[in-house]
Amino acid sequence: MLKGFKEFLARGNIVDLAVAVVIGTAFTALVTKFTDSIITPLINRIGVNAQSDVGILRIGIGGGQTIDLNVLLSAAINFFLIAFAVYFLVVLPYNTLRKKGEVEQPGDTQVVLLTEIRDLLAQTNGDSPGRHGGRGTPSPTDGPLASTESQ
């Protein structure tokens, strides 16, 4: 059981996750402070009556009590700023790199497989492997039909 846990830790995914959590927490704190110190005061002044503290985003319900929609709006702005940053700084580059890796990998294995097939065919026909391309890559004249036509 401990061996499996050690392998899980050694894979590196847990370290990446820990780094992401720490950076995400720090970034969330930064955006929260930005929203609290700059955005919230601006929102608080929207539609406020000069004689009272009631306005468009603060609804007076009597007895000096208000429903404060400014807090909700500030939290929504905070959420969208964090979501925007995470998507464009983490998710989008990650998906781009993952797709790029997936596209390159099948092409490389296909070339290796075709090179092995060509070399096996060349050995069967008595030719030296890679003699047509010179660099170990198949040329247009390489292949099973090219070797049988010359016989």
UniProtKB/Swiss-Prot annotation:
Membrane topology: Multi-pass membrane protein
Record GO cellular component, one term: plasma membrane
Membrane-spanning segments: 12-32, 71-91
Location of this chain's protein in the cell: Cell membrane
Cross-referenced SUPFAM superfamilies: Gated mechanosensitive channel
Keywords carried by this UniProt record: Cell membrane, Ion channel, Ion transport, Membrane, Transmembrane, Transmembrane helix, Transport
GO terms for MF: mechanosensitive monoatomic ion channel activity
Region (Disordered): 122-151
Primary location group: membrane
InterPro entries noted in UniProt: Mechanosensitive_channel_CS, MS_channel, MSC/AndL, MscL_channel
Keyword Oxidoreductase: no
Protein family (similarity comment): Belongs to the MscL family.
Subunit structure: Homopentamer.
Biological function: Channel that opens in response to stretch forces in the membrane lipid bilayer. May participate in the regulation of osmotic pressure changes within the cell.
Descriptive protein name: Large-conductance mechanosensitive channel
Organism, as annotated: Mycobacterium bovis (strain BCG / Pasteur 1173P2)
